Every structure is written in structure tokens, then in C-alpha cells.
């Protein structure tokens, strides 16, 4: 899988939605592996739900999205509702700081940092298996580590 952010260069040079679509279209046509689009505030580029859904429906290999921004759960919920079966991989990001809310919104996984994946894995597995209470219990145990990591 190839994970990519939208094109940007500093605070002032950003593509519009047409340019973003064309960027990912060219990549989709050039590779034969799945593409995950990373929607992160670091880029300063806003990726609308409509644009993400359009790319999932129209571009080969684009069906996974890593959402890491304020209001991730809300955006994940809207993305899943709008995109339906075209959205195969809605993922949580940001070191799993909002993991439970994002799983509740329909995230199918997370892409945390490399610090504690073995501790995060059971949270996701419990939640996806319908054992939310067990997931929340495990998450509560590791949340101090996640908070510590986010402050480094």
C-alpha cells in the first residue's frame, strides 16, 4: 500500500480540489497497488468528504483513508455514510488519541506510531468483535502512554 498526502509546499503553495484530484489520478494510473490518502492538518490542505468519496469511486486503488484532524470521528462518519462500499479502509490516526471515538464512528483500524502497536491491537480487535467494553478497558490502560507520546 502506498500512503500519500495531498500535494503542498509550505503554507502558501497548495493545489485546489481539481489539482488534488488530478494528482491522485496520475498516481492511480501509474501504480498497481492500493493507495491510502492521508488527510492531515500538517499539509494545510483541506480534503472535503465529497472529494474523498469521488476519488474512492473513480480512481483505481483508492479506497483507504487515514483521517487525522480535529473532529476525526465526525469526518469518518460522514465519509463512511457518503462513500458506502467505496470506502474500504477508514483509519484513525494521530497516535490513536481519539481511537475509541473513531472506532465508534466506523474506523476499521488505526495507524498509530510505532511505540505501542502491540498494546493498541487488542483495543481494535475487541471493538471490531463487538466487545466495546473490553476495548474501552484496554484503551483506558494505555491512554496515559498515548497522551505522553502526543506531548513529545
Predicted features by range, described:
Residues 1-44:
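Active-site beta->alpha loop and helix N-cap motifs at the rims of alpha/beta catalytic domains
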Residues 26, 41-152:
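Catalytic alpha/beta core domains of metabolic enzymes, predominantly
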Amino acid at each position: 500500500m502506498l500512503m500519500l498526502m495531498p500535494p503542498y509546499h509550505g503554507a502558501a503553495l497548495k493545489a485546489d480540489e481539481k489539482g488534488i484530484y488530478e494528482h491522485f489520478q496520475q498516481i492511480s494510473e501509474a501504480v498497481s497497488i492500493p493507495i491510502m490518502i492521508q488527510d492531515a492538518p500538517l499539509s494545510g490542505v483541506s480534503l472535503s468528504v465529497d472529494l474523498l468519496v469521488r476519488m474512492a469511486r473513480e480512481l483505481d486503488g483508492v479506497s483507504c483513508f487515514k483521517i487525522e484532524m480535529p473532529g476525526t470521528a465526525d469526518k469518518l462518519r460522514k465519509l463512511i455514510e457518503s462513500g458506502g462500499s467505496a470506502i474500504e479502509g477508514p483509519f484513525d490516526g494521530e497516535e490513536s488519541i481519539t481511537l475509541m471515538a473513531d472506532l465508534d464512528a466506523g474506523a476499521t483500524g488505526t495507524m498509530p506510531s510505532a511505540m505501542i502497536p502491540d498494546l493498541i491491537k487488542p483495543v481494535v480487535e475487541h471493538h471490531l468483535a463487538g466487545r466495546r467494553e473490553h476495548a474501552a478497558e484496554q484503551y483506558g490502560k494505555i491512554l496515559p502512554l498515548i497522551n505522553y507520546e502526543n506531548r513529545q
